[in-house]
Amino acid sequence: MEFPVELLINALIAGILLGGFYAAVTVGISISFGILDIVNIAHPAFIILGSYIAYIVNQRLGVDPILTSILVLPLFYYLGSLVYQVYYLSFEKRGQEALRGLAFFFGLLFVTEVILILVFGVDYRYVQAGYIDTTLRFGFLDLPMRMVVPFIISMLLLAALQWFLSKTFTGRAINAVAQDQLALSLMAADPIRIKRIAFAISIATAAIAGALLIIIQPVEPSVGREYIGRVFAICVLGGMGSLPGMIIAAMLLGIVESITSTFYGPSWAPAVAFGFLLITLAVRPAGLLGR
């Protein structure tokens, strides 16, 4: 029996596209958990909130979800700033962030879900855009635009964040705040302000990730929970605080899931993907590019 090379190549490309989306979903966690050491378990809820905002604007005004996500970036940034301020004053300042802080984000996750259920119900919602149902074909290679467009936007988002974190004073301060807050204070930078900015940026990325999610698939309020395990797994696999490592890990997880789904069925994909995670961490406990 001849090996289906064409099927494998399509699965590889689909995995890369899926990995790009996973990277956009995970980048916020990579900042809050990987750099700031804040276990924001509610991050997927903010992503779903971004999806619903994109849905409302798309249905009522016909605006493209990606454009909507860019327009609401300031809203999500200030929402993230507010959430961090509450978290800092209530838990971090008192040294209670470990358990009570985690409970705070769990509560935020479920409260957001309940509000969305009360407003929208549990029916799946989707958006309309000219490219969503379009597939580009190059010989045997299929490129669904509902995956290609999110991949391109993800890469642009990640490139912008990498530039910001490595080339600007605030970005370098964000990287430094996790390593030496005292040295940062001596540089006339307020560590709490820097952490608030970083956390706000992490929540702002959820607006874009939410728009990409609803382009790829219909959403309902609890869909975000499906991604909790994946995003933390990608963050740890890539190496804590390493944006390039996170991108590589997201691509690897996407490829493993895609190939497994293609040849063995979707039900095997999560098990094989997390098995791959465990093996990798057994070999490299610090992650792929962990420090």
Regions found by a protein language model. Give the residues of each.
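Cytosolic-side transmembrane-helix boundaries in multi-pass membrane proteins
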Residues: 119, 179-186, 190-193, 263-291
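Glycine-rich helix-loop "coupling/hinge" segments at transmembrane-helix boundaries
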Residues: 43-46, 216-244, 249, 269, ...
